């Protein structure tokens, strides 16, 4: 029946999404009591690693054949950061797989289950011998495409930043408070 296939599709899609729980520990927050971007970034990378490992594409497995993952781009957009001691979770899924790159997305979810931010990333698998990109579709007979998920991620894809001039237009000494208000 159609209803049964819809339930199967939802379950199948849900199995493609990894959910990982965290707590904003006191040593992971800034003086405002909010999680720092560096710690959030570390959690995002760990979630990508856990998710890939659980599906047979983790660093340890790739290293056996002298391959590794390299992060090419990362864009993060947040409405708010978790506070000290707050529980939060991160979901991750693969949006697309191309021959040389894969798109991995993330949702940051607060303790009430509300999505408070998203991230998009672009990854390449490279040969540790040649340092050149490897063909993702040749890995495990292309089975990585079985994990592609159509979960929405409502932020723009990260694009390459083009530098218009080689000459700096200004100099700025950045201080912590300057960066908070960007």
Model-assigned labels for residue ranges:
Residues 22, 76, 92, 106, ...:
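Preference for bulky hydrophobic residues occupying beta-strand positions
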Residues 38-64, 177-179:
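Active-site helix/loop of acyl-thioester processing domains in fatty-acid/polyketide metabolism
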Residues 97-142:
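Contiguous mid-protein beta-loop-alpha structural module that forms a pocket-lining wall or clamp
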């Amino acid at each position: 029946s159609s209803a049964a296939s819809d339930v199967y599709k939802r379950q199948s899609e849900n199995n493609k999404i990894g959910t990982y729980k965290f707590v904003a520990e006191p040593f992971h927050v800034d003086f405002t009591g909010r999680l720092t971007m560096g710690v959030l970034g570390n959690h995002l990378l760990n979630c990508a690693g856990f998710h890939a490992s659980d599906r047979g594409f983790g660093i340890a497995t790739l290293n056996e054949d002298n391959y590794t993952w390299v992060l090419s781009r990362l864009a993060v957009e947040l409405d708010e950061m978790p506070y000290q001691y707050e529980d939060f979770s991160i979901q991750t899924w693969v949006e697309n797989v191309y021959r040389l790159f894969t798109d991995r997305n993330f949702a940051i979810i607060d303790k009430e289950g509300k999505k408070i931010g998203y991230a998009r990333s672009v990854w390449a698998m490279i040969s540790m011998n040649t340092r050149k990109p490897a063909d993702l579709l040749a890995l495990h007979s292309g089975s990585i495409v079985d994990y592609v998920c159509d979960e929405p991620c409502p932020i723009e894809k990260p694009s390459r930043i083009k530098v218009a001039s080689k000459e700096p237009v200004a100099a700025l000494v950045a201080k912590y408070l300057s960066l908070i208000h960007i």
